[in-house]
Amino acid sequence: MSKYYPLINKNSEFDAVILCDGDYPSAEIPLHILRNANFICCCDGAGNKYIRRGKIPNAIVGDGDSMSKNFKRKYKDIIHIETEQDTNDQTKATRFCINKGFKNIAYLGATGKREDHTLGNIGHLTNYRKEFNIKSVMLTDYGYFVSAQGNCRFASFKGQQVSFFNIDCSKFESKGTKWKTHAYKYWWQGTLNEALGDEIEIKSDGSFLVFRTYLSKQDSLGRRHL
């Protein structure tokens, strides 16, 4: 049976939200999810940003290199330092949330700033699905990434912009997309496809990433000219 991935909107609910230290969310959907989160775990320096906006997270997790001594003293009850350097702060925060029993996790602020951090954060989604068996979504100001494997169905809408990033598939076929897909050798080859209707079906034999936009291409162009 194929796994189903729903659309993400401002009413989507998650067990926990992990706020990373990239560009702070500014679009309506990620901000609404952040404001209404059941549990907020900030990655290291993201705790500073969140608190400066008048909020207190449930936890701040990381190696502590972005926090001052005064900050650490003031918020010692919610700060959890992990000094090992084999993983990044996003992964440390993920492990923390999993240990709390959370399995459905949204990542915000994971993109922007340094591009190597952005690629690393996105790439970790595949590891989290395989190693931790969690359901995760990474939201940006424009859309959202999910990691998937095998045969899957993705909720969509006509004109939604969709990009596919092959990880290890030798077979990758789609139904409901404007352009035919295959097991892409390079990441750029699967970008900028488009949904024809309310569902995209993927038949594959491996892992891949999917990015779906909040708006259709036409809506995006209209919003740009407002």
Regions found by a protein language model. Name each.
Residues 141, 148-226:
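Long, charged alpha-helical interface segments
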